[in-house]
Amino acid sequence: MRPALFLCALLMPVALLGGCRQQGDWQHLEGVALDTGYHITLNGDLQAAERDLLMAAIQGELASLETESETLRGLLLAGWPTRDAAQLPFLASLLEALRGAEQARAVDRLDAVLAEFGIDHAMVELGGVVRTRGQAGRRPWRLALDRSGLDDAPAPPLRLRDAALVTREQPGDAVMPDGGGERLLAVSVVADTAEQADRRARELLLAGPSAADMEQAIRLVVLRPQGIDIQYGTALEPLLER
């Protein structure tokens, strides 16, 4: 059994930090964790007691993740000559990447909690990281891709089922590199889990657009001398709502 379920009784008061709304057969759970908000939409016939138990399990899982995060950050900062990350750009960037990875891990672990409660249709979002379970009614979940520095032109939404979506952006302003060339501004990745999508997105940001395998379920936002170019991987095309 997962630690969150053991902590349910102890952490029931913590559930008050979150919220729950119901619209027909849909339940909406929300709260704050890991420096951001989370939103869970699920389709399940939950009674009030079951809903409270689920909220307690979610808060227990998030409390465990917060503890793990604090421990890891403490160990990381202890190895540096100063704890002022603002004076160390590399450390600040590392901590930001760590937080993104933690948020992706949290989404996967919340999805696992929903699975333990027998919930087959749900969507979890935390810090912009999304994972879907089953469908939204009779259709896959419908998600909007992050604009990531683009203009106001509409982008085709995604239809996802049992998959995760992560979008990561390059830090800094959208400027051309010295000598021209191209720069990858942002990448969106669809994968089976949020951690897989997050890891792949960060690998692509480091490697650049020329190293991308365009047969995968990815979207690249590339800055070129001629302007911004949007590239969709072939595995992503069937998921786009045209």
State what each model feature region is.
Residues 2-242:
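Mature catalytic core of soluble alpha/beta enzymes
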